[in-house]
């Protein structure tokens, strides 16, 4: 199984917010940042590690793709929305 922090970074990169959101189509029905962040907290991952190795790592990936003109503003906005969803769980820490 893929490391949960890597899964969070991948979901942020792809803009996968939660399981019920059908975007992106290839990840339909899979858990998103919302569920994975909660799972990481339940597994006692430090919030700072979830932030740096999960959420920020995913935004760095999408930022690199944007600089290389491989993605466009809508994809970056979906990634930002996904990161914000994860941040909602980390705000209490």
Regions found by a protein language model. Give the residues of each.
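Long amphipathic alpha-helical segments
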Residues: 1-92
């Amino acid at each position: 199984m893929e490391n949960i922090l890597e899964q969070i970074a991948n979901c942020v990169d792809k803009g996968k917010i939660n399981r019920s959101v059908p975007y992106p189509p290839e990840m339909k029905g899979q858990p998103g940042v919302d569920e994975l962040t909660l799972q990481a907290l339940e597994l006692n991952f430090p919030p700072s590690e979830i932030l740096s190795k999960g959420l920020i790592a995913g935004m760095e990936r999408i930022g690199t793709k944007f600089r290389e003109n491989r993605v466009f503003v809508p994809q970056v906005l979906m990634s930002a929305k996904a990161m914000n969803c994860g941040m909602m769980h980390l705000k209490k820490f």
